[in-house]
């Protein structure tokens, strides 16, 4: 029996949703990018104030610059996403099922749910790490997030006008990071999720990250199914590239 998300959508509805993707989602991305830019400014102002008053410095410079880099990459992703959505090509094949819209939207804005960790029981919020491990693990978490966001920005730059939120068919990109892996943007997002999980090291964050992984994998599989159905050459691409992470043979070649 088909589920609710398998419900077909009409071409007229799909066209309206694609227009929403092109003209409304960029506004949301622009707002998020502007908010991140304001946060970066506040972060720098606070750092400058602390360092201009001897004895008030709380963080090592390397930690501050790493966190600043991470937040700049988040800003870059949000800005690039909005710009690429505005300039993307019309899809050759429109989304034809409700899941092609709902799953990508849920995956794209799932990060909002990370704030729910604060409403979990205290036992699910507490870090499972010993005190002595927390700082080095936090640094590893920051590194994971920076690498993840850098990979995502790199992939969006190569995807350009083929970038989309909803599952549809546009030109297949096979150069840059796509030469090694079919979903480098999602690879980057998963590394960021790993960073969040390491930073929190709590049961609550583990549950939320597991939900995010499921959504990303479902989204990627739907994209591949639609592309393989519409483009025979994509099947050869499937055979020689990794899903979310590069194959060892691809790296050796």
Model-derived features: positions:
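Membrane-anchoring alpha-helices and their flanking helix-loop junctions
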Residues: 1-166, 195-253
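Solvent-exposed interhelical
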Residues: 170-188
